[in-house]
């Protein structure tokens, strides 16, 4: 295995602080928000501020990055160099799905469009009214961020972790910007996403199919299918179609490149 791959593939286990701290911060923020009854006030303030920061099509594009298929397309080019990233994301997906859909069904919380008057906030895309808690997009953003940060070597983690986390926070914030979620939903989704990433990374250290040529080829073929499905999926944000199509091209190109140029490590024939 080459040095560049082994540096990320080796079990450079992150410290317990990296495993626990991001999720703990999100849980604490969610608890304070609920205890102080600031959910609605913060939503209106954040949503109003977002409309002054960037136009709707920008927020729609950012929010599409954190859709399920969009996020897989986003991370697909890593397959050629960092196959563990995609493997850990795939392994985290079942846990993340159970978390978000289980809580959505249990709580069945209304979204802002079902509670607030239409003139109180800005909506980008189709208005959503049901199954608000937790935010699936926020969960997805933090699954990707968690995988990238936790799979990285300590040196890379120290240098880039905060950049990756800032990008994930921006994707989460876009859910309030488009009027789809309460702030409480974002924190709950982010916490679940990070913990799902922890599990996915741990499982990827046990099931190392990503080190084999056949494993890389299988993931590449799966990501081609993801890109095709993304091309036809209605994400609910017509203003963000530009990002959706960019993700299709990005994911398809990344998958094809990984299949044409297998990851540079010693694998069985």
Where in the sequence are the language-model features?
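N-terminal transmembrane-helix/juxtamembrane module of multi-pass inner/ER membrane proteins
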Residues: 1-70, 101-130, 262-269
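Interfacial segments of alpha-helical transmembrane regions
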Residues: 18-19, 75-99, 161-164
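Alpha-helical transmembrane segments
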Residues: 18-32, 92-96, 165-168, 221-226
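Alpha-helical transmembrane spans of integral membrane proteins, capturing the lipid-embedded, hydrophobic core
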Residues: 25-26, 69, 89, 93-97, ...
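Membrane-interface alpha-helices at helix entry/exit sites of multi-pass transporters
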Residues: 57-60, 87-88, 155-162
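Hydrophobic alpha-helical transmembrane segments
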Residues: 63-82, 137-142, 146-147
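Alpha-helical transmembrane segments of multipass membrane proteins
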Residues: 96-100, 104, 171, 196-197
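Membrane-embedded catalytic cores of phosphoryl/pyrophosphoryl-handling enzymes
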Residues: 122-265
């Amino acid at each position: 295995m080459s040095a560049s791959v082994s540096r990320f593939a080796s079990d450079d286990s992150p410290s317990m602080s990296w495993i626990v701290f991001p999720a703990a911060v999100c849980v604490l923020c969610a608890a304070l928000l609920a205890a102080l009854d600031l959910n609605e006030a913060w939503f209106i303030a954040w949503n109003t501020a977002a409309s002054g920061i960037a136009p709707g099509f920008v927020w729609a594009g950012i929010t599409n990055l954190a859709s399920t298929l969009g996020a897989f397309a986003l991370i697909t080019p890593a397959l050629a160099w960092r196959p563990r990233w995609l493997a850990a994301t795939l392994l985290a997906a079942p846990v993340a799905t159970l978390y978000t859909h289980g809580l959505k069904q249990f709580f069945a919380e209304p979204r802002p469009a079902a509670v607030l008057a239409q003139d109180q906030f800005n909506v980008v895309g189709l208005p959503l009214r049901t199954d608000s808690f937790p935010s699936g997009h926020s969960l997805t953003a933090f699954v990707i961020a968690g995988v990238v940060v936790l799979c990285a070597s300590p040196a890379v983690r120290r240098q880039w972790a905060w950049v990756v986390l800032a990008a994930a926070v921006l994707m989460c914030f876009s859910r309030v910007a488009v009027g789809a979620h309460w702030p409480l939903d974002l924190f709950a989704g982010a916490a679940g996403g990070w913990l799902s990433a922890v599990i996915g990374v741990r499982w990827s250290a046990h099931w190392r199919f990503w080190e084999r040529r056949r494993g890389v080829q299988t993931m590449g073929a799966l990501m081609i299918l993801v890109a095709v499905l993304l091309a036809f999926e209605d994400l609910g944000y017509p203003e963000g179609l530009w990002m959706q199509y960019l993700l299709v091209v990005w994911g398809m190109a990344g998958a094809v490149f990984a299949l044409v140029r297998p990851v540079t490590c010693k694998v069985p024939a």
